[in-house]
């Protein structure tokens, strides 16, 4: 399966881990999707989910200056997760920033409010500079 589908599963895993009553570990959360999606790139999913969780404070510090009158805590959970995922991938992978940004915009269109993809794209455009 494609990286795009793996990013969707990474997003859903991170969303699940953000639930207030969740005591799941990263490996437990990922194991829930393995049975239904054996063709996903689980190495990539684990790398992305672990990287975002392990570097959350640094990612938030990187993102915050570009939020214009917003704070990380005030963002929708979906937007916060997508920004963290994309920022981590831009900073820690060889994937071209343009590809990562496009995937983040597509995730936003799929999982967030109508026009939030413009906000996500604007923040990520500043981060990649």
UniProtKB/Swiss-Prot annotation:
Pfam families listed in its UniProt record: NusB (PF01029)
UniProt entry keywords in alphabetical sequence: RNA-binding, Transcription, Transcription antitermination, Transcription regulation
GO cellular component: cytosol
SUPFAM superfamilies assigned to the protein according to its UniProt record, in alphabetical order: NusB-like
Record flagged with keyword Transcription: yes
GO biological process: DNA-templated transcription termination; transcription antitermination
Gene3D superfamilies, per database record: NusB-like
Highest rank taxon of the organism: Bacteria
Example GO molecular function: RNA binding
Function: Involved in transcription antitermination. Required for transcription of ribosomal RNA (rRNA) genes. Binds specifically to the boxA antiterminator sequence of the ribosomal RNA (rrn) operons.
Matches recorded under PANTHER family: ANTITERMINATION NUSB DOMAIN-CONTAINING PROTEIN, N UTILIZATION SUBSTANCE PROTEIN B-RELATED
Family that this chain belongs to: Belongs to the NusB family.
Protein name: Transcription antitermination protein NusB
């Amino acid at each position: 399966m494609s990286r795009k589908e793996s990013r969707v599963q990474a997003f859903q895993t991170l969303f699940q881990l953000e639930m207030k009553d969740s005591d799941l570990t990263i490996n437990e959360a990922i194991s829930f999707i393995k049975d239904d999606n054996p063709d996903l790139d689980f190495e990539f999913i684990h790398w992305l989910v672990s990287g975002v969780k392990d570097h959350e404070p640094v990612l938030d510090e990187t993102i915050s200056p570009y939020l214009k009158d917003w704070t990380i805590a005030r963002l929708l959970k979906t937007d916060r997760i997508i920004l963290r995922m994309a920022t981590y991938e831009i900073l820690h992978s060889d994937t071209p920033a343009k590809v990562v940004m496009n995937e983040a915009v597509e995730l936003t269109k799929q999982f967030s409010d109508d026009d939030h993809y413009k906000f996500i794209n604007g923040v990520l455009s500043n981060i990649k500079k």
